[in-house]
Amino acid sequence: MEKLLIEGGRALNGTIRVSGAKNSAVALIPATILADTPVTIGGVPNISDVKMLGDLLEEIGGRVTYGQEEEMVVDPSNMVAMPLPNGKVKKLRASYYLMGAMLGRFKKAVIGLPGGCHLGPRPIDQHIKGFEALGAHVTNEQGAIYLRADELRGARIYLDVVSVGATINIMLAAVRAKGRTVIENAAKEPEIIDVATLLTSMGARIKGAGTDVIRIDGVDSLHGCHHTIIPDRIEAGTYMILGAASGGEVTVDNVIPQHLESVTAKLREAGVQVETNDDQITVNGDRRLKVVDIKTLVYPGFPTDLQQPFTTLLTKAHGTGVVTDTIYGARFKHIDELRRMNAQIKVEGRSAIVTGPVLLQGAKVKASDLRAGAALVIAGLMADGITEVTGLEHIDRGYENIVDKLKGLGANIWREQMTKQEIEEMKNA
């Protein structure tokens, strides 16, 4: 196992390039199951979640090859409806997209309940409600979901809560169903449009992706295509926040600025200079920071995935700010770690109250989930002294080549192997 060491206190400057969107990739890769001929996906991020999904597709008979320029080619022609109750499937939160895709193609699936980030209850009841409306019989047996259907028929499905996962999963199951499916109160995230674009290129008939009503007219079969993933707005937002936090000037390249309007607005409100053009955003962090309040909302509101990194930035701002997470109330595991670094933060219910400015101090901290990891990396870059971050497997799930990318901005950051004693201490902590 490795740990990450960061020497803080340097202003970062330069250009950092954003990879393809993790939250798109983990849905686009399972979507290839629905085709009869090979699908090529470009801009695939080199992260552990993607590698694991590729392995799972091979387990069910797919051929997965990696080409030039972050390309992944999936040949689904020999795939079978193999049950996946255990193993890798449980390590991956987004493995639930295999349910919709396998149900859509084979009319049956067995998928172990997913893992990934532990952010309190993330129920999949809306997914199951959608599958049942399409005609599937769904049971939960020994920690795996069993799905079976004689045939799938289009239905009108109203989501009780706006859920990206459920919206995409129902789309995957419905594209080859008989008749029309209407998803009401659908999520509007850019990643949903990305999945709909891939499916449409494969021959699906989908209207309304990106609005709260999506209409799908089922087709008998889908074919391969070539599709390039959108840039990762969460990675981009992380590096925008990092630029503001480090006090230098950072240009984030390969972005769609419209996807980041809520983040741009909050940074400007805090006094950060932000310039946008077609596919770049430049953040200048050398001004005094004003405190702001953050409330996470579904897209186009402020993303829950950037709540933790922004909390770190607020430790540098003058005054007291409140960060409220309306999406995942349990997403405050990073707060204790930031406190070890001298942050003044208290948690009340779904809110964190941050008082600043404080100078963060280097410390030994542990990432408990992906975006907590990003928050701690930013804290390490702001801090006086050396910060040691463990739990890198979480960071590697969603940030491609983070060490090399940050070195390119002038950060002093490196990985080291952990000793047996350190691994034991971490497990017991």
Swiss-Prot record:
Q: Any idea which residues bear 2-(S-cysteinyl)pyruvic acid O-phosphothioketal here?
A: 117
Q: What does it catalyze?
A: phosphoenolpyruvate + UDP-N-acetyl-alpha-D-glucosamine = UDP-N-acetyl-3-O-(1-carboxyvinyl)-alpha-D-glucosamine + phosphate
Q: What GO molecular function terms would the record report?
A: UDP-N-acetylglucosamine 1-carboxyvinyltransferase activity
In the record, the note on similarity to other proteins reads: Belongs to the EPSP synthase family. MurA subfamily.
Q: Where would you find this protein in the cell?
A: Cytoplasm
- According to its UniProt record, which residues of this chain constitute the active site? 117
Asked if Acyltransferase is a keyword of the record, the answer is no
Q: What does this protein do?
A: Cell wall formation. Adds enolpyruvyl to UDP-N-acetylglucosamine.
> Keyword Iron-sulfur, does the record have it?
no
What is the protein's name according to its record?
UDP-N-acetylglucosamine 1-carboxyvinyltransferase 2
This entry's Enzyme Commission designation comes to: 2.5.1.7
BP GO annotations: cell division; cell wall organization; peptidoglycan biosynthetic process; regulation of cell shape; UDP-N-acetylgalactosamine biosynthetic process
Indicate which residues the UniProt annotation says bind UDP-N-acetyl-alpha-D-glucosamine.
93, 122-126, 305, 327
Identify the taxonomic lineage of the organism of origin: Bacteria, Bacillati, Bacillota, Bacilli, Bacillales
